[in-house]
Amino acid sequence: MAQQTPLYEQHTLCGARMVDFHGWMMPLHYGSQIDEHHAVRTDAGMFDVSHMTIVDLRGSRTREFLRYLLANDVAKLTKSGKALYSGMLNASGGVIDDLIVYYFTEDFFRLVVNSATREKDLSWITQHAEPFGIEITVRDDLSMIAVQGPNAQAKAATLFNDAQRQAVEGMKPFFGVQAGDLFIATTGYTGEAGYEIALPNEKAADFWRALVEAGVKPCGLGARDTLRLEAGMNLYSQEMDETISPLAANMGWTIAWEPADRDFIGREALEAQREHGTEKLVGLVMTEKGVLRNELPVRFTDAQGNQHEGIITSGTFSPTLGYSIALARVPEGIGETAIVQIRNREMPVKVTKPVFVRNGKAVA
């Protein structure tokens, strides 16, 4: 039986179509995925992300532990509340999960990990934390609501008290602050400004209803996927998994190679991959009629006349742009155009950077 978040009843009251998402009953949409998508791009929408896992890490060696566990380097985190995005890799350089880590104090950090990878993540973290004496607390007592869009922060702030409004005033992206009952972070998965707000389970339903009253539109998994794809954001198990290097998933920027003497899990394998080369993640745009779908083959001929084939990892119709877009993992050497096989048709596509929309506008 699939689990329910504390907001399940609110979803049904809002008319959601519920689906099983990695063992959780979650809203796919509330009537119109397209309307929900546009609400986030032009105004404010919200998502129940309570199925994601918040993990608090405490102990005097927590920073040392995370510098070993993660490919990105938490030594960069020196201001309380600052966050960074990182892959958590296995010894062969594959991605166990991608996550966000927050720094609060030298002996207190917080991770937010994906729902689909929860059990293996917790097992991996626990296994490697033991020698460092880390206390691990899984925060199943918290729900999380993502409020996203150009008006999201202003509308969410109408629910905050004076101290909470003061706490978030001027807060830059990728920061989080505990303000009363609310943990408020300037993070998201849409390419828009907004907050991800964690709060006690028993207060989540009232907060959700108050956001609806404030004019924030409930949004489901369908819009979440088209929004993140337009923003060029990876989805675990599609753009990367335990067999795929972050170098082949447009995550090279999340690997902290310096200092060279920092030993993190997967480093040796990554260095070999960097030397020998890997596939890469690119964007594809198809303005002709049709939709680019996951797992369709992508073919191209390189400058030397050699033929190559890659694969679409995520594809959809872009509601913001009005045509089809995709992320694709392809061999090195791809040029500005390629061919995608859609049934019995060979469709020309333009090859772009793996990002299509930022802050509601097309990325040139």
Curated annotation (Swiss-Prot):
The keyword Transferase applies. It catalyses: N(6)-[(R)-S(8)-aminomethyldihydrolipoyl]-L-lysyl-[protein] + (6S)-5,6,7,8-tetrahydrofolate = N(6)-[(R)-dihydrolipoyl]-L-lysyl-[protein] + (6R)-5,10-methylene-5,6,7,8-tetrahydrofolate + NH4(+). It comes from the Bacteria. Keywords: Aminotransferase, Transferase. It holds the Pfam family GCV_T_C. InterPro entries: GCS_T (IPR006223), GCS_T_bac (IPR022903), GCST_C (IPR013977), GCV_T_N (IPR006222), GcvT/YgfZ/DmdA (IPR028896), GcvT/YgfZ_C (IPR029043), TrmE/GcvT_dom1 (IPR027266). Its EC number is 2.1.2.10. NCBIfam families: gcvT (TIGR00528), PRK00389.1 (NF001567). The glycine cleavage system is composed of four proteins: P, T, L and H. Belongs to the GcvT family. This is Aminomethyltransferase. It comes from Escherichia coli O45:K1 (strain S88 / ExPEC).
